[in-house]
Amino acid sequence: MTILNHTLGFPRIGLNRELKKAQEQYWSGELMIKDLLLVGSELRKKNWQKQKESGIDYIPVGDFAWYDHVLTTSMMLGNIPERHNNTVDSIDLDCLFRIARGCPPDISASEMTKWFNTNYHYIVPEFYKNKVLKYSWKQILDEVDEALLLGHKVKPILLGPITYLWLGKVKGEYFDRLDILKDIILIYKHVLKELSNRSIDFVQIDEPVLVLELPKKWKDAYHYAYKELSGITKLLLTTYFDSIEHNIEFIRDLPVQGIHIDLVHGKYNLKNFSSKIPSEWMLSLGVINGRNIWRSDLLKWFKSIKSISNHHRKILIGSSCSLLHTPIDLVAEKHLDKEVKRWFSFAVQKCEELRLLSSALNDNDIDSIKEWSLPIYERSVSKRVNKIEVENRLSNVLIDKHQRLSPYKTRSIEQNKKFNFPILPTTTIGSFPQTISIRKLRRDFKLGLVTEEEYTKIIKKNIKKVIKIQEELDIDVLVHGEAERNDMVEYFGEHLDGFAFTDNGWVQSYGSRCVKPPIIIGDISRPKPMTIEWSKYAQSLTKKPVKGMLTGPVTILLWSFPREDVSLKKIATQIALALYDEVLDLEKEKIEIIQIDEPALREGLPLRKSSWHEYLSWAVDVFRLSASGVKNTTQIHTHMCYCEFNDIMDSIALLDADVITIEAARSDMELLESFKKFKYPNEVGPGAYDIHSSNIPSVQSIISLLNKAMKYIPLKRIWVNPDCGLKTRNWNETILSLKNMVEATKILREKMKDSECD
């Protein structure tokens, strides 16, 4: 039986980030809606054609989104929060963007969080009791029609109904969100009927929550949902990011026609798994890693798939997950070292890998895949990869270096005496707005168009401006603004040995936000200080403390494309040792507050709780290692993004940061409930306003949020700060927002003084 191939999705941003640029032009009023729609249409055509030319048999349709695919599903279901509704009973792109971004002056955006354990984000669906859901957004049908008209062999993609419900949150009056499953299923049935009328072979229906440890009522919901959806069109139940072996007993009873499994990130005995599922099911094997950039060992996969390919079952081969998480095309990289470039495979090359592998399997000819796999061996013996001096230092790391000199209670007394901050001390998270001219300066400096002297002069001028603004606003703890940094991970990668960098390796994080992850190609070490010059200069401009700003070891690891030949723990420990040296150098230069950001800490958790302990153990260890050399009077801060903290509070506390800042504003301080329950002992900056929205927070809204925070955290341990860095905001928004933040804080301080007098 012929083995066909498919991808689970393709990057949507465009090779030159065309979607990002068009979105931002539309939001700023520089682009008409018809022009934005045209950009989307052209990108879809290019993506479909590129996959077809690369040898993909089934072209995925439904992977394109104007912000994220979960929000697209909310639009399809008519699940629009009332505050975002149009004045007339209709929905449109502006409605979608309001949900994602909010609307000035005071319509808040919906919450945003991480997509499973990736650095991609989605807008969290909001579920309200008695909300009427109805089919409202026909994007999937329109795009299927587009692709069919172009002659493609189409495979529509839908986010599965159970996963959609799992990812959302009940708002307002509580009810069981599974109560609305029936209404959702009616809409899915309508969409599937429409798709069945379009002569497609099957629908890819994504249910990644099947890799989790599900409560019984959610398993029961699967039985109900897929019984209702059966018989309309063929369904390929699609899972990724981990194994579903633990759930196979109920999955195999679902009335679907096939299953996709992630063989890269899930542990499977393929022969055994194949024997457990119905013989008539298609089996789609995710063998090409959709989350990393390394060239695939096609010989390994050839042997594995051959072992079951004569079992008279229809087999598909595909990417492990959507290729959304990888850069688009390696051919666009003109400056990568030739040796290193041969080690990589981006989205287009992964399509070619699928073509090579399916051809080899069908023709029983391995010559082409042998040739493809040669660079994998070359890399294993390259001197760029393993370095004896790094290995030697690693072997001498002792566990007692993973802690501060004294416990927090002792340190806090010494720090309070040293800094004498007022109650509710104010600070920011690190970055300040980056103008077009600053981005151009960095680019020109890299290209050699600007001298180091000119570059340094302009960066220092920017630092001086940032310090002056913060002093005028009367912020207590300052930052230098990070004008020299393109990205909080890439910057450190550029100053560490063991990394490679792309010119165009962009990956979508959320909406128009794209990141360009560095690639960890070998052992990591710090050849020289990375941040000292800028922090030292900033501190020389003010008597107020200026924070040294570092990205933590887990975040550098997880927001890079990591090696696959050594453990993540080993890579993280190498990074921690480099940061340990940097922290001590900052302290020597009288930088007495040092922030080590770990926004990715929770993202790295294995998807199943039973596997959490090992990861959290080393993740905590490497953070503590990086901060372990400083004096009691040196204050260590950390920052975390979009986290559900409830089930990892033990580990958060074990980090032993003197101050943790988090993103609780967008959740209306709900995230602090876990800090209260745990009786978190250290200081907390919960985030006084949401920086991801262009709304200027009012003084009263900030006071309201801080009053809520005081219900969870003792007043003396609360810091006041924006909920994230300010790089993506403009200067006017930033100054007005910070002005209101400081004013709100001063009002509360006066109120506290008055209450003390009373």
From Swiss-Prot:
State the organism's lineage.
Answer: Bacteria, Pseudomonadati, Pseudomonadota, Gammaproteobacteria, Enterobacterales
Q: What is this protein called?
A: 5-methyltetrahydropteroyltriglutamate--homocysteine methyltransferase
Keywords, A to Z, come to: Amino-acid biosynthesis, Metal-binding, Methionine biosynthesis, Methyltransferase, Repeat, Transferase, Zinc
Q: What is its EC number?
A: 2.1.1.14
What is the similarity comment for this entry? Belongs to the vitamin-B12 independent methionine synthase family.
Q: Which InterPro entries match?
A: Cbl-indep_Met_Synth_N, Cobalamin-indep_Met_synthase, Met_Synth_C/arc, UROD/MetE-like_sf
Task: Please give the CDD domains that the UniProt record associates with this protein.
Answer: CIMS_C_terminal_like, CIMS_N_terminal_like
* Binding positions (L-methionine): 429-431, 482, 597
State where L-homocysteine binds: 429-431, 482, 597
- SUPFAM superfamilies to which the protein is assigned, alphabetical: UROD/MetE-like (SSF51726)
This entry's Gene Ontology molecular function terms read: 5-methyltetrahydropteroyltriglutamate-homocysteine S-methyltransferase activity; zinc ion binding
Q: One biological-process term from Gene Ontology? A: methylation
User: So what does this thing catalyse?
Assistant: 5-methyltetrahydropteroyltri-L-glutamate + L-homocysteine = tetrahydropteroyltri-L-glutamate + L-methionine
Q: In which pathway does it act?
A: Amino-acid biosynthesis; L-methionine biosynthesis via de novo pathway; L-methionine from L-homocysteine (MetE route): step 1/1
> Which cofactors must be present for this protein to function?
Zn(2+)
Q: What does this protein do?
A: Catalyzes the transfer of a methyl group from 5-methyltetrahydrofolate to homocysteine resulting in methionine formation.
List of residues binding Zn(2+):
639, 641, 663, 724
Q: Catalytic positions?
A: 692
